Amino acid sequence: MSTITAVWAREILDSRGNPTVEVEVVLESGATGRAAVPSGASTGTREALELRDGDKDRYKGKGVQVAVANVREEIAEALVGQDALRQVNIDNILIELDGTENKERLGANAMLGVSMAVARAGANLLGIPLYQYLGGVNGKLLPVPLMNIINGGEHAPNNLDIQEFMIMPIGAETFAEALRMGAEIFHTLKGLLAADGHNTAVGDEGGFAPNLESHAQAFEYIMKAIEAAGYRPGADVALAIDAAASEFYKDGKYVLAGEGKEFDAQGMIDFYTDFVERFPLISIEDGLAEGDWEGWKKMTDDLGEKIQLVGDDLFVTNPEILAEGIEQGACNSILIKLNQIGTLTETLDTMELAKTAGYTNVVSHRSGETSDHFIADLAVGLNAGQIKTGSLCRSDRLAKYNQLLRIEEDLEDDGIYYGPALKEAFFGED
């Protein structure tokens, strides 16, 4: 009943209008699984390779027909007849079939689409929710969303170098309440920006993309929006950023072109420390460049006891690189992106290693997304506690939030929203 009988792929478009891979898997029972693969804009150099066609006359070189063909032919031939319920075996077959360290032969986009679709087919075969299939009977933690409401960097055509300014509704009692808080703050922020004559167009992930005087002004607008929406900064809503510092690291310096400033690693740490002292900022992702290991160790020494320091480009969801970071004392958290590593099994291995080492897991989308909401189930099933999936507009972002609403409803009283625990960890009790 769980034997794979067919594997198929097609080229679809993501939220930026670029091609990506969608895979369907059919089992002997008739159960099916479908999955679509996301794509990033600011990427780590050690990520698994996303295979693109390179034909400039078609989708400006971004087509994925080769990856699709790899699924339809070589991968399908290897997996037909295999047991879909043996996820580790399926993923090991994919890894061995590819035979490269960074999945450049078959493409991480081809492999991940298959890996995710097989998991969905398995869940559908057993008639259980995907989150339960991934995490077992103990998957019950509804994650705190890191909601990206101001975009900059590679995600927006404005003068902000920091890529994402986010809010975290830690004062909510349920995920549904957290989502409502985020939406109310988002719409309040829009009104404040518009009233001051700022552009309220949105970036790739749905956050506003205004030209502002400084990064501090972005924080100030968000603080005003929180208060104007009727909430308390810190007590109800915390702040987070994704600096994506590798994108503005030039010739050994961190160049904040929008503010006309340049820093070494210590200068950048001091820059962030000022924000931590002035605002309820509890999480900084990619605050330094991916190759600046010495800087990361210093930043962890300086700020690691106070806030969450998240490695994204630094770790690229790779368990071997994470192990190196743990040994060196860099960061205290990891961003989890399925397409950085290319299979579900390797993703779960990375999350387990992080948790064992006392690092937090933040499950994440990519800037080029689809309506697939796999990561919502992953976050709950693995009790990650945090999810980063964009702003409060664009259906590709809301697909994940809406799935979390469904999961919370399905869990009923067994579901636990992680906000109060996170609030107590950073701010204590009211």
Swiss-Prot record:
It holds the Pfam family Enolase_C. Transmembrane segments: none annotated. Its main location: cytoplasm. The gene is eno. It comes from Maridesulfovibrio salexigens (strain ATCC 14822 / DSM 2638 / NCIMB 8403 / VKM B-1763). The keyword Kinase does not apply. Binds a second Mg(2+) ion via substrate during catalysis. Keywords: Cytoplasm, Glycolysis, Lyase, Magnesium, Metal-binding, Secreted. This is Enolase. Belongs to the enolase family. It is an enzyme of class 4 (lyase).
